[in-house]
Amino acid sequence: MAPKKHSAFMVFVTEWRNHNVEGRRMTLPQAVSHCGTIWEKMTAQQRGPYQSGAKDADVADRAKRERLNCHGQGIAQVDQVQKEAAESLMHMKRSTERLVINAKKSHDLENAKFVFATFNYFTKALTTDVYVPAEFAACEYSLKEGIRSIYSSMIDPGQIIFGQGSDALHHSSTTHDLPLPPNALGEKNMAKLYRNIIDYLTKCQGGDKPLIVFTPAENIAMVKSCFRYLECEDDSKDGGRTIQVFDIEYLLFILKKEVMDVADLNDEKINKFVTDAFFKKDFFEFTAGIACQYHEDNDRTKYCTQSMVTRWAYTFSDFMCGDLAITVQPGKHIPAHTKPNYRIISSDASSLAHESSFDSFYSLPGSRVKKENQSEDVLLSSSRPSVESSSYTPTDHTAFTADLSKLCEFPSLGMRNSSKHRGLDVSAQRERNAGAWNLPTHSRSIQKFSDNDFSVTGADGKHKN
């Protein structure tokens, strides 16, 4: 059913009641009756504004109202946000793939440079995505050279969001343990810090290339917000250059696939879930000497941004340098100091004390040498003393001592031995069981007693009575 159209006359009645004291005292039927005589005397020119107002009201009614979801948000607005997020994700993936594939086409994949970056923050606004930064670190990395350079700085924002001091204190005490403003450490000039970061990224990636940093997916929103926090204090805007933040886990997946393709290795078992699981294991989490001095002194190296970007670089090297036969360098691809945690056992038992090998946990090709001609007996003799050389004499404690080669002795379910074999074998069985201590009761020798061996005191008296 089509909606009713507005009447120009009713528009006139409504306006007359609103502008006249007498009209406000009347009911609607009375006002319609009174305005009818006035409407008849009006010219077409006088009625024109009311007719236009009626048409405008019709148009407004025909306009659809925006539908809302259960949270009171406009559905069209929510769809637009989701569409922009999907486009941003697709742009990130395509840009990452383009970086890796271009390096592969130029036969320079091992020298491709990537920048890993992350922030620590004091607190986050309750209703917006504003983060107050506390610490920043970035690392320039390539497969061949490992860690090329590291930029790290603590940040003193001067103040935190009003009313969130308790949240900031709780977050700091449970993570990075940095002192809160006004006692915060580090750079106080946000504009200067942002320009220093821009200069470092430009030096790493070149002035004509977009500034791209990689960080874990769960930190992307936080890192973008912290960059905006620093950028808003910079009036120069540095020529309008912005920093793009991409997913480091997707970079690991794409880079691993291309590295295995270059090395002519089978990559059927490599997928996004495998690479994500490898990255999240964080094998180098407790490596000493890679965090800043403050976090080293306070035993919070796990949450230090400098330690984070360094561990990510070590993870990339551990996962892919072996595929390209790249020799790892301590301090660049792996920690500078490692602890031996295994040894290679030689086939010669006498050389055990002389041939212990340095070991690390890293997946380097040829790190474990296995000799095919090494027999199992030699390995057993080299790892434990032999039986012949020991003074221990084994003793048979077998509970079942019957001869299973005889049909009559073979145990059966719900069946007794035949009577013709029982009498012949009982004496032989008892002789075999004479020295056994752990036999069941029915297998032990039974001493025969006569009736005279059993007597009950007072029994004779009772019979006499």
Swiss-Prot record:
GO terms for biological process: germ-line stem cell population maintenance; male meiotic nuclear division; negative regulation of DNA-templated transcription; oogenesis; piRNA processing; regulation of miRNA-mediated gene silencing; regulatory ncRNA-mediated gene silencing; spermatogenesis. Residues 422-433 have a biased composition (Basic and acidic residues). Keywords: Cytoplasm, Developmental protein, Differentiation, DNA-binding, Meiosis, Nucleus, Oogenesis, Repressor, RNA-mediated gene silencing, Transcription, Transcription regulation. Residues 373-394, 419-443 are annotated as: Disordered. The keyword Cell inner membrane does not apply. One of its GO terms (molecular function) is transcription cis-regulatory region binding. It is found in: Cytoplasm; Nucleus. Residues 2-69 bind DNA. Its main location: cytoplasm. Residues 381-391 have a biased composition (Low complexity). GO terms for cellular component: cytoplasm; nucleus; P granule; perinuclear region of cytoplasm. Involved both in the piRNA and miRNA metabolic processes. As a component of the meiotic nuage, plays a central role during oogenesis by repressing transposable elements and preventing their mobilization, which is essential for the germline integrity. Repression of transposable elements is mediated via the piRNA metabolic process, which mediates the repression of transposable elements during meiosis by forming complexes composed of piRNAs and Piwi proteins and governs the repression of transposons. Belongs to the maelstrom family. This is Protein maelstrom. It comes from Drosophila erecta (Fruit fly).
